[in-house]
């Protein structure tokens, strides 16, 4: 096999594709791969960069993928390293870490939709990383495409000169060659010193069944080869290099070395991705670099929920399944917890509601588990009367009211872009969700950008669905965490037959407690089947009952066999039945259907 000659750094381009969800990012990636013949026509399929079934079904990108492309321009061979990124707000950490390894980004905007909230958010991440941004207007072949207006939109909203914008149609394969040439002429080559000691940033890691934990790295300085011993700076441990590869969605391409400026996969024979944490630095064990790469933001969970197996004996199976998913998802964390109502399960941290849905669906589909998920919550900062601070992510952990000095809840800054005709409905929704308006800006005659600060708790329940319904699906939404603010919060408990069902407890704004409690008990009354005894459903704050509904018992005619008119005999039987029901009520357990736990999500 002929030894490959290293690609000169001046001929390497590392770039990402950033876009709002559904703007045709994965289709554009497919076109660039096909144009560069990185995958044969026989193996090429749509959304080749989306490798999970769930990504293909939902039409979304969850896991950032990379591919090495070779392209010849003006007689010179170039290497283009393409990193596809997710578009949904929950997976913006995947975007930020992918952009750390690039010099440029294609900003894809749908010619029929214009700039949307997530486009703006990802652009700011790219600008913070000093990336060269190349605007790309996609779907120009559609009859309702409005290219001129979108160009103006890009300039007015983001402040990027639209003059350089490339017009393409990924579906119809228009403008792809021009775009590849623009990438080469516009995006700068990587900087770095090939003669310095090795410094490589781990910007992704995952678990391979055959090779163990793999690190996707960008070589910032120096180079790496298969003969080297490597030091992982975060752990201080040394490992031999078992293999080096170029990334490709279908198969890893082996190589003997990775040079300065390149992107590649490193196999060190490790059993867990925790040994090669994302954001860590690899260096040469013999001649290490003086300090690791800084400024990398790790993913932090934003939403927490309890996951419990319906078959209680499958607790260990759930643990195994979560551990397997965690191998490829550094943002997923979990710890065991128990609930009086649901038994043993796990408190799981997610990036957002979509991330939670995806994880729950994968656990049920890939590991054949039947799960109950409790209502999602955020982390509250609870200041106690003894001047200590407790962080609470499970409502059942909230200390008694007389021990609490104040509670602070996390806030986010939300950016929403909406057609102006829905502005009234949207502002009403934001006010209902305790939003505080910071800015309102008309992008053009028909579109408005709103900036609000909102309690995180208000957006983790049903905000996204309500936003879509009050704007007929036209509004786009993005958020970033800002700070914790003091709030007037209480714990709302639900009691069924006198017992608090801990899995149904929620932390809520005090002014909304009565309304939510009333709606909750009314819904529960419809969902819980009638028992042989009377069941009281109560909503309480502290020891105070604020709402109550009663499920009447199923009647049994105990006097049916009493013929004749002896009223005392009938009365005796009815009294006996009443005594029996009283005893049953004291010891009877009420089975709650799964819908009861989901009821909290559905109630505004």
Curated annotation (Swiss-Prot):
Its biological purpose: Required for accurate and efficient protein synthesis under certain stress conditions. May act as a fidelity factor of the translation reaction, by catalyzing a one-codon backward translocation of tRNAs on improperly translocated ribosomes. Back-translocation proceeds from a post-translocation (POST) complex to a pre-translocation (PRE) complex, thus giving elongation factor G a second chance to translocate the tRNAs correctly. Binds to ribosomes in a GTP-dependent manner.
As its record notes, the protein acts as a catalyst of: GTP + H2O = GDP + phosphate + H(+)
Q: Where in the cell is it found?
A: Cell inner membrane
Q: Return one GO MF term.
A: translation elongation factor activity
Q: Which family does it belong to?
A: Belongs to the TRAFAC class translation factor GTPase superfamily. Classic translation factor GTPase family. LepA subfamily.
- The broad enzyme category this protein falls into is hydrolase
Residue ranges of domain tr-type G in the record: 10-191
In Swiss-Prot or TrEMBL terms, this protein is called Elongation factor 4
Q: How does it sit in the membrane?
A: Peripheral membrane protein
Keywords, A to Z, come to: Cell inner membrane, Cell membrane, GTP-binding, Hydrolase, Membrane, Nucleotide-binding, Protein biosynthesis
List positions binding GTP. Answer: 22-27, 138-141
UniProt xrefs under Gene3D superfamilies: 3.30.70.240, Elongation factor 4, C-terminal domain, Elongation Factor G (Translational Gtpase), domain 3, P-loop containing nucleotide triphosphate hydrolases, Translation factors
Give the EC number.
Answer: 3.6.5.n1
* The keyword Nucleotidyltransferase is assigned to this record: no
An example of a Gene Ontology BP annotation on this entry? positive regulation of translation
User: Per its UniProt record, what PANTHER family does this chain match?
Assistant: TRANSLATION FACTOR GUF1 HOMOLOG, CHLOROPLASTIC (PTHR43512:SF4), TRANSLATION FACTOR GUF1-RELATED (PTHR43512)
Question: Which GO CC annotations does the UniProt entry carry?
Answer: plasma membrane
Against Pfam families, the record matches this protein to:
EFG_C (PF00679), GTP_EFTU (PF00009), GTP_EFTU_D2 (PF03144), LepA_C (PF06421)
